Each structure stands twice: as C-alpha cells, then as structure tokens.
Amino acid sequence: MSDRNKARVGEFLDRVLTGGDIEATGDYFAHDMVEEMPFPGQGPGLEGLKETLIRIRSGFPDSNWTVEEQVAEGDKVMTRFVWSGSHQGEFLGIPATHRPIRVWGMVIDRFAGEKIVSTRILMDTFGMMMQLGVIPPAGQQAR
C-alpha cells in the first residue's frame, strides 16, 4: 500500500498541480479532508482546497511541481518537492511580478483507502517572497 500511496501523490502533483486539472482534486482527496496547516484564506474540506489551488494556478499558470523524494510508512506519505513557475497573476495580494520562482517544500499526507484525508504542507515561503522581490535579499534594506 505504501508504494501505491506514493504513486497517488505523484499522480496528484502531475495531473492537478502541474497539469492544472483542478476538478480532478476529488480523485485524490476525501470530501471532508483536513488541511492541518491551511493556506491563508483557505476554507474547509475539498472545496476549500480546490479554491486555494485555483488561486495558486491563477498566480502561477505555468506551475511545475516535481517530486524530489518520498518516504512512506503505514498510512502516511512524506513528499519533498520543488515548485517552480513564473508569477503572472495576483497571488496573496501581490500583483504579478513576472519573476520566476523555485521553491522547496514538504508535505505529509495521510490516506484512508485511495484518498488523502489529512495533509500538512511546509514550503519555503520566505524564500519565495525574496524571489518575488517582496522581501529584500540579505544585506539590503526594504524600500
């Protein structure tokens, strides 16, 4: 089951996050899934997740999510990933900068059967904000 769960996470990254098939999110997540560390403004359950993914996709329409490493134990899968793309639309209140990003992150997904029932994600948000020019690089003062 661990290998199957790892494959499901990889399929989700390819089909939904990189491919943009947001409607397919329900193929991978339970309707009442729980986001343990919700994205700012994220509503509950599957619908809240889909709304968040739409916002991410509109800010970064050329998003590419790559699995770097996965570890599975029991009903959990930990995935280390890289997210890249260019900031072409509003994201978290930040107007498009047209700058590229490359952000690392990790997510722990818990499965019940074929679907993810809880997830928690940690990304290098600080690094992303520096890449977008919102936070100045070390040694430079904010304007």
Region roles according to the model:
Residues 1-143:
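C-terminal and inter-domain tail/linker signature
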